[in-house]
From Swiss-Prot:
Record: residues binding ATP: 531
CDD domains named in the record: Anticodon_Ia_Val (cd07962), ValRS_core (cd00817)
Keyword Cytoplasm found: yes
Similarity comment text for this entry: Belongs to the class-I aminoacyl-tRNA synthetase family. ValS type 2 subfamily.
GO MF, one example: aminoacyl-tRNA deacylase activity
EC assignment: 6.1.1.9
GO cellular component: a single term: cytosol
Swiss-Prot/TrEMBL keywords: Aminoacyl-tRNA synthetase, ATP-binding, Cytoplasm, Ligase, Nucleotide-binding, Protein biosynthesis
Name of the protein this chain belongs to: Valine--tRNA ligase
One Pfam family in the UniProt entry: tRNA-synt_1
Function: Catalyzes the attachment of valine to tRNA(Val). As ValRS can inadvertently accommodate and process structurally similar amino acids such as threonine, to avoid such errors, it has a 'posttransfer' editing activity that hydrolyzes mischarged Thr-tRNA(Val) in a tRNA-dependent manner.
Organism whose genome encodes this protein: Halobacterium salinarum (strain ATCC 700922 / JCM 11081 / NRC-1) (Halobacterium halobium)
GO terms (BP aspect): valyl-tRNA aminoacylation
Amino acid sequence: MTELPDSYDPNSIEPKWQDEWQERDVYRFDPSESDTQYVIDTPPPYPSGNLHLGHALGWSYIDFVARYRRLKGDAVLFPQGWDCHGLPTEVKVEEVNDIHRTDVPSDEFREMCIDWTEDRIDEMKATMQELGFSQDWDSEYRTMDPEYWGKTQESFSEMADAGMVYRDEHPVNWCPRCETAIADAEVENIDREGTLHYVTFDGVDNGDIEIATTRPELLAACVGIVVSPDDDRYADRIGDTFEVPLFGQDVELLADDDVDADFGSGAVMVCTFGDKQDVEWWMDHDLDLRTVFTEDGHLNEAAGEFAGLAIDDAKTQVAEELDDQGYLNDTEPTEQSVGSCWRCDTAIEILSKEQWFVEVDQDRILDAAADAEWVPEHMHDRLVEWTEGMDWDWVISRQRVFATPIPAWECNECGHWEIAGREQAPVDPTEDDPAVEACPECGGDDWAGETDVMDTWMDSSITPLHLSGWPEGTTLDEFESVDLRPQGHDIIRTWAFYTLLRTGALTDEQPWDDVLVNGMVFGEDGNKMSKSRGNFVQPDEAIAEYSADAVRQALALGGRPGSDVQFQWKEVKSASRFLTKLWNITKFSTGHFDEDTPAIQDPAYRDADRWLLSELSTVCEDVDEAMSEYRFDRALRSLREFAWEDLADDYVELVKGRLYNGRPGERAAAEHTLYTAVTAVTRLLAPFSPHTTEEIWQSLPGTEGSVHAATFPSVEYRDADAELAGKRIAEVAREIRAWKSDQGMPLNADLDRVELYFDDSDDDAARLDTYDLSETVNAPIRLIDGRPDVELVPVDVDGDDSEIGPEFRSDAGTVMEAIAAADPAAIQAQIHSGDTVTVEADGESFDLDADWLTVTEEYRASSGEEVTVIEASFGTVIIYE
């Protein structure tokens, strides 16, 4: 037990405990320490180096759960991973070093990515530790380490053996900036204004036709024209042939139900490919494939004189040439939604490429998702909507460098692909040979290692398997779902979707029991945080201004899980004030504790004690229920209300007399009650404010080890009668203290007596234990049934000289004297009977507006004594000074 410092100083407390926890391995996962384990599938973030408030919200939720589950007796695995691979890192390294990845050898570029990533991880870890997150750093993993990406390769091989991975040519989303295929989930639609071009196609042995397109640069790739079968304008022209302007190929007019006859001219050219709709028409009508775009976003030789132009430049020049040759009839602006690369915002193209794919089994994904508990429930709908909308398999190959190598080799003689066995992982096919010497198809021995790498979601989608100990400690058949997947709603269509897909495909099990979804953090102005808007706040800025514990509370109170949270400085300030209040209450309380306090036997509790313990029992149950339902806002609000109002403002004030002047037994009861409440509140608050509660815990007698290794408080002392009695005692004490303050009286000023009148004569609470109340208000207390016999008597009249002066001028003084000398009761009677009051002075009458007069009233008891009357929830309080 250590002495609590006089003042709350988070700047010294928080770093001290962060170091202490790490040195003592307080959060190390040891499954042998408990019969129950709780495993959290923590998000492995992209290590940008910038741990923003959105991260802080998500990881605060995770930490609340982890600390709560430890208090409940579980051995908790709270790991931390880092999703290192992929486009974000490569793009950043290219930007920082002002290079393109092809400017340096692949191995050198990969090392640059690793070095940059390691530095960013260190930065993010430092902020995580400043916020007091309780990861088991012995369970840290990085997807760029061979120990991890070897598992990704093993899972790839398992799925390939099961026929769920294949290589084929198929249209794919392609980013010209990043020069790689990307999955549907990595395409983000951006709304912008485009231009609709009305272009004439000359007929071949038939009349002309006008089509409408926003992409004239794709004319070289045009392989057909489609119209609605219900469009009367073209009903008799289906099958006609037309020549594509500038490029000369012939195309046929086709009917298709997906055409919107009201858009443009109603005739649409089919190109390979402008968008996914083009792909569907191309496949449905078995059209030719004409590729005109290069991987880096230029037109190829098939575009003739426009070859070599960037796509945007080609759009402009082709439109100009159409106009010059008389094919362009008109243009008009149009709103369009353009698919763009999630990382660089470049408009994606659709190219037909030979790639690696993973089969998407929608039914299995939906079944596994339905078996999980989604918090909030409507987030499950997002997953369902995305899954049901999937129309392509998952393209997993990427034409990049910094990612998990695809473990496969191509036979240069027959084209057979040999996939590595699980036992070969981790393997780099660009450096290592396949396990077989001869090709099983043709017997050849000339192999080329696959240079494509995997989508980074192939890494992070096996996190539940990694946490289960696969493949070293468990088999896929033995896999059991982990307890919790916490994540943001923005990656439901990626991380959640791909994990459901991969875990289901590999184990036929759901990956997790619960999915806890957090929203985004917005600025104080309600807008998305942005430096340009001036509403951007970094976690370390808020920590420096107040404390990590205060920031965590503010995030908890921001709203229920799944909802977006508006960051508000006032909430952080309020949390800081609460922590200071709790500190001061604890400091006061520990002054009355000693080593024997926890062991006090059979305390002689009074009503105030029983009331607080009963309220505490309710709070413990409420917090437990709220935490189990992930309602951190509700749990913290309930706890703060009890600690601030019931414990600090009411109970402590009620029992100060007993603590200082009470008999030993009475004093011991108050001490034990206070000890029970403070130790319980400390543990209940520990998930939210770990540093402050740890410091407080160490100052309390009878405690051992860390508060974060303690047990969740269970205070079984429910007493409805005591709760009612205590609430009334506290209410009266609170009202009298407020009245004394308003009167400018010292709070310890003696009063003649206080009478409590109870409206309900059968109210058992009329027999209150008034000892603590009497000590608190410094007055004898009488309990009386019924209503008090008091009367409100007018005792003084005051005139408004700002009205009377101008009205009566030289007589104003005489009128004011007459008002002062008048009978207040008579004046009040005139006010009640009309709008005018008459006063007399020196034999003269003066008429005044009733609004110019104020009558002061006082309560008088039947004895004639002046009293103060306070209406209470149970009846009336009468104060005799």
